[in-house]
Amino acid sequence: MENRGQKRMEVVEELPADKRACNSQDFRPSTSGSSVQAQANDTNPGHENVDADMDTSSSASPSSRSDEEEQEEQDKEDSDYGSCDSDEEDPRQRVLQDYQRQRSSGDHGKLKSLLLNLTGETDPSGQLSRLTELCEVLSFSTEESLSSVMANMLSPVLVKLAKHENNADIMLLAIRAITYLCDVYPPSVEFLVRHDTIPALCQRLLTIEYLDVAEQCLQALEKISRDEPVACLNAGAIMAVLSFIDFFSTSIQRVAISTVVNICKQLSSESPSPFMDAVPILCTLLQYEDRQLVENVAICLTKIADQASESPAMLDQLCRHGLINESTHLLNLNSRTTLSQPVYNGVIGMLRKLSSGSALAFRTLYELNIGYSLKEIMSTYDISHSVSSTHPINACSNQVHEVLKLVIELLPASPVEDNQLASEKESFLVNQPDLLQQFGRDMLPVMIQVLNSGANVYVSYGCLSAIHKLTCLSKSGDIVELLKNTNMSSVLAGILSRKDHHVIVVALQVAEVLLEKYRDTFLNSFIKEGVFFAIEALLSSDRGQQNQGSADLSQKPVTKEIVKCLCQSFERSLSSSSQTCKIEKDSVYVLATRIKEGFFGPEVFNSEKGLTDVLQNLKNLSVALSELMTVPIDAHVLHDEKFFSIWNQIMERLNGRESVSTFEFIESGVVKSLASYLSNGLYQRKLSKGGPECDSLPFIGKRFEVFTRLLWSDGEATSSLLIQKLQNSLSSLENFPIVLSQFLKQKNSFAAIPNGRCTSYPCLKVRFLKAEGETSLRDYSQDFVTVDPLCYLDAVDQYLWPKVNIEPIDSVEAKDQAIECQSSQLQSTSISCQAESSSPMEIDSESSDASQLQGSQVEDQTQLPGQQNASSSETSSEKEDAVPRLLFRLEGLELDRSLTVYQAILLHKLKSESEATNDSKLSGPHNITYERSAQLGDSRENLFPPGSMEDDEYRPFLSYLFTHRLALRLKGSSHPPYDILFLLKSLEGMNRFLFHLISLERINAFGEGRLENLDDLRVQVRPVPHSEFVSSKLTEKLEQQLRDSFAVSTCGLPPWFNDLMDSCPCLFSFEAKSKYFRLAAFGSQKIRHHPQHLSSSNVHGEARPVTGSLPRKKFLACRENILESAAKMMELYGNQKVVIEVEYSEEVGTGLGPTLEFYTLVSRAFQNPDLGMWRNDCSFIVGKPVEHSGVLASSSGLFPRPWSGTSTTSDVLQKFVLLGTVVAKALQDGRVLDLPLSKAFYKLILGQELSSFDIHFVDPELCKTLVELQALVRRKKLFAEAHGDSGAAKCDLSFHGTKIEDLCLEFALPGYTDYDLAPYSANDMVNLDNLEEYIKGIVNATVCNGIQKQVEAFRSGFNQVFSIEHLRIFNEEELETMLCGECDLFSMNEVLDHIKFDHGYTSSSPPVEYLLQILHEFDREQQRAFLQFVTGSPRLPHGGLASLSPKLTIVRKHGSDSSDTDLPSVMTCANYLKLPPYSSKEKMKEKLIYAITEGQGSFHLS
């Protein structure tokens, strides 16, 4: 079917200049450029890839599911089938069965007759006629038409005819009949084998006379090899199908290799010659370009290596055949053939087995510089995709794990027994030290990078094991320089602070080896970087006293496979003792003691002093900074002078000749002192509106202004240094846990709490006990009860309160009302769960703190899909029920009410478990005590509501810094990470408000007389790139957590997950935030993980996100009234969770292309200046007046036009409502908009407050003027305070030499004379006395009240689709990328890397080279037109060309005899460009430009 579809695509070429869209049958581009026979297509078995997945996993079981699961599914299928039967269908079914019986009987009779005729026929023409008829009958027969007797009788006859020497047609038809017989009646294979069919077919392949006969032999052998691989092997089928493989087409070559794959599954090491002789041919085939062919060859070689792994002689023979040389080419990232992940991992595993058993392979890998290839793999592979946190047993099938196993195999341990192979390997490395040094130079840096990146415990253990072996083997000083350059001491210090004993033991072993071999180099470094401190901490804590190795075994899933302990996960084979941990009980304590006593004795290290000179100096500066807190807060000058002096000394140390280590930076206390000084200690307190702490906020703003000036005085260098130090400190100190869930089998459970209902996942067993001393509550009489793990503690409160309360509820209503008010206003972007009856594992798409803090969340869990907004209309009585009245404790510690029961228990358990924990121990039973809540619930009220602090110019920055402050539970028992997080958040805020803070500093300097010229107020800032605030370690942890689908779907996520994303989203990469956003906003309907897909046969060992099954709705749009169509679409589907596909009136075709173009057209329609939505910027429209362009353009992007409160703007507001809905729906469906919004408008979307300085992003010239006027007002005010009004009158307050009164400014908004600046009228003139009111009026009209209604309208429209609060985790640039895709289109490197050439074209075809040159010559507008022509949108999604799905494909277009007269055509749903083979580049450019300009605006079928 694929080729027929392809044929149709190439022949039917109507309207060539028009874009093509898919009809109801989606177009799927072929991966092959050659046309093959129907039989060849039939023999490309779909099961090959499945086999590849299974076979490349060294620990995979044959079945992807357990027997019980299969039986349950079979029972379900039987039940479903039975439910479909009815009396009405029985007669039709009987008729069908009668027809099938009659047909089978007729076919059987025909076959019998043909068999008799063939047996007695000797005339070649008669035999040919009978065979033709036999093939026709067999091709339409069913299995019921044949029997074993018939197959047994047919087999010898067909085999005899297949050996016919004189007639090629008889041979061909006989072999074709054999092929059909295997297809129709698989049991016939046994009879065919019995009658020597395989030798006959092999003979025809070894002496090829007729190509079509040979091809048919390959088809037949492929069928037979599926059921009788051993017989094929013994008959020499491997060499038969491979001997002349070069003579066949690609499709037939695939059939031949499929035969070899089937045979290799049943290889036996007892008879090596049949498959060993084939290795040279297979190695040659690895050089071919066809991916499917090369993958199957790689699978064959992997199987052969498996069988030969026990024989060093056979492994050596494989190496001599060139297996290693050809295999390593496949690992090259620039290889012509890209292998699938399972096969790629299998090749790496094959190399490991070769190296393990063959000294020749070991030497060859080193001589080929395998370290470079492995380094490239490790450095480009996403560490977050490393060993699956849910399936550690399947880690061997993971790419990073396989690489590490090969690395460890290439570093042999010193032979302690009579092991000749190990001795040969070691002597080779001793005699070739340069090879080992090169291997170390390649691998050490990347392994240390992996250790620093937050890799899980399995990968960390592998890296450390390899480093330990490398340090033991190395005999030269090169390794010392490498370790010093990669700061190994700091890495070890961080590793030793972890909780897993396996990792700690290896880290201590590495430290011991380094001290033994290179004591002089590393002794001081270990002290400076904190290794000695970490060792002492181990000795003084319980981590060093007991072995917690068993903690890792708790991570194993329920499986029939043998699970290795972590310390054996990189060993070569499973053993009967693989579950026994090798670590002795006190191994950590013994090792740590030995290192301390052997290398850090009293004569070497004074433990009482315990400080380096650098650390002591920094400690003194930290104390001085803390003492500065005692100076009165309003003493600005004194504060500035002392802070300048202290900070300059700190920076001198950080930039000094002797570097400051991460350990010294942390231990000095500088971070805590700086955080306390800048925030005046508020960052550690709970703030409340109107509290005494708020009085100090203006002074705090001043401190941050001064600190900004200090950090950015010499560009971004100083700030970057501080950020890097803080990032290193955070990576070293943070121990945020990763929750490893095992995929518990879904089962029906009953949750008594909160509302007694069935769940499809396990419940928690909890016993609620009244707290000791609690007298106002009664005992809860029941024993253990089942609790829904997804409900919030407030729901448990709501359930228990009536059962344990003694006094009437009215007595507590008064104190509850305050909480009601606070709870109703809270917003959040955290991921919460909603277990709807239809899909209990989904993630709630309407997430807010209100829903989290209210027990009504549980009621919402069973609501119908159409009632998702019902919670917004809950009654006041329901709110009262949600007020927290009980306080819950587990083992004496209070549980956090903002979490689910599962999360609250999880948070408690994580404090005492290893760094990567498992949820199997969380099901219970648990004893939770309850008592009356004595205080109001924690509230994150807005300390900066609109209208507050009107005279405080620092309000936007302080609002950003303190409104969404760090959750106090992040503080925990460890202060340094909390201090670091606050400083990083502060620096990111300063970086984000850099123009604001620097402008304020300049205005104050002008006011104080430190600046004399208004031109000196001009600010040019260089912010630090956002990427510097991203913590790679936390991002990798977040990625790993998001990949754990069960934890995500059940809210089994550690609390830091939501806390950090809510308060410090800058710490995470844009890609990680995007995944979080989609889960939080849209839930598992958009990205759904299926636990049942993670069986042992999944060689990735990881959860595969698959597209959710959201329903699709088609919408008919009208191009002439595009906004009206958009309004109708949003009215119908805006608040529904459906994917919309657009088709146009009087046009055929629907799908991705028309839908993307629809959003592009709507985007342009919203830019119509006649709508009155946006500010005008006529100067930017080059060569076209606004009224003729139809699209408003602005140098700063689109920003709402100000409208006064008295203006009639209902139409404009409706347009903004529609715009908000369209934007939200585009985000929900993953569509790209072509809407150039200004940065300031994005800030409004994100809920940020704008100030006068944000006008810089709307109208830079207006902002410049306002800043200068503000500086004059500031100078006047300060002189008046110092010298009185008479003194102020004497100072120079002119505007560039002109008095304010002489400027003749009216009280009207510049550019909008109809907008009066209250309380004055347009007739009033501006003077020095009312200048401040004039400035406030302009700012208010431009970015505050003048646009407030428009912004509220936009947000209300957006909230109809999903909560706009979910966007708050992004910054303005990221939000623009989310909405509008990439700003840059594409470069030539991207074009070469991410465009596919097929169906007649390759990357070296002349027409393709013409096209690449033309694209390179295109200007930006032509590139946009080309993209819209091919994809439907002029913008690329985030990630550029690489993110296009399907991939942009260029194929040859077959049209008329003269290609130069044809136009290119496209299929936008597949991003498919059909390009005629033009005779010249000039002709192609002419036709392409004509097509992309004139071919827009309509869709027709190809």
UniProtKB/Swiss-Prot annotation:
Pathway: Protein modification; protein ubiquitination
Region (K-box): 1022-1096
ARM repeat positions: 143-183, 186-226, 228-265, 267-306
Cystine crosslinks: none
Domain HECT: 1128-1502
Role, per record: Probable E3 ubiquitin-protein ligase which mediates ubiquitination and subsequent proteasomal degradation of target proteins.
Designated name of the protein: E3 ubiquitin-protein ligase UPL4
Native source organism of the sequence: Arabidopsis thaliana (Mouse-ear cress)
Gene behind this protein: UPL4
